[in-house]
Amino acid sequence: MEWPALTERFLLYLAAECGLSVNYRESVRRSLARFTEWCRSRELSPQHITEPLLAEYRRLLHEEGLALSSCRIAMVHLRRFFRYLNSRAVIEQNPAALVKGGAVRRAIPETLAAESVAKMLDATDADDIPYGARDRAILEMLYGSGLRVSELVRLRADQISWEEKFLRITGKGGKTRYVPMGTMAAKALQNYVQQARHVLAREGHRVPELFLSNRGEPLTRERIRQIIRKRAASAGLNEHVYPHIMRHSFATHLLENGADLRVIQDMLGHADLATTQIYTHVEAKRLVGLHRNFHPRGRKRD
């Protein structure tokens, strides 16, 4: 049985046998939709799911910037879902039985040095049509505008103001914000739209999303992740590079260069300033390192 059918049976079970509310079931539906999209992108059936794969998925949620509480909720939903599949003999063992939702702690965000970002961008040839142009635009938008990967895959032409160089983004909770595009990001996106997108689009198949796969379908979050990993490797970067690290780098580099924290909050679409303030810890850690390395009283004595 395929993922969609299993999801619907589970939701029916939650309603009919458990008596759970509509709101709770909708929350479960969203969690399972995200998880099953990831499974389908990797051609994983329910029988393929293991405890290490679920731990990998939990790390992915964290890397994509999901709040710790949301990660916990998602893993609670998955534990319940796989317990149900096991009870119905769809799977022989429950791979989620020992997976904990709260194992990922809130840490200082990982970032790339500006030089590493530049190296990856320079190694992605925008004149290589269509994939170089597409991938360069993806990298420029994630780093130049600080988009979430979920916002990037949904980006449409009607959200772009070319003249004023800004994007109209609908983020978490349906909130709209306006995000500036840097000159290089706007140039890369325009190059992709004008020179490459029509090569990827399928004739007679209208797709509103801007970023397309080789089959003319909208790129998924997992495919964006694969593209970024590939481009980082091609640039010779040894760091673990993933979509959300570009957003972290966007915010951190703005802060390092003197941007106001509340302006960064607005551009990131954070409802709470406290969420943005974690980037001040990145800057503080950097300054401590500089002091330790260069100040006469900061270095350890032999």
Predicted regions and their residues:
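Conserved catalytic core of the tyrosine transesterase superfamily
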Residues: M1-D302
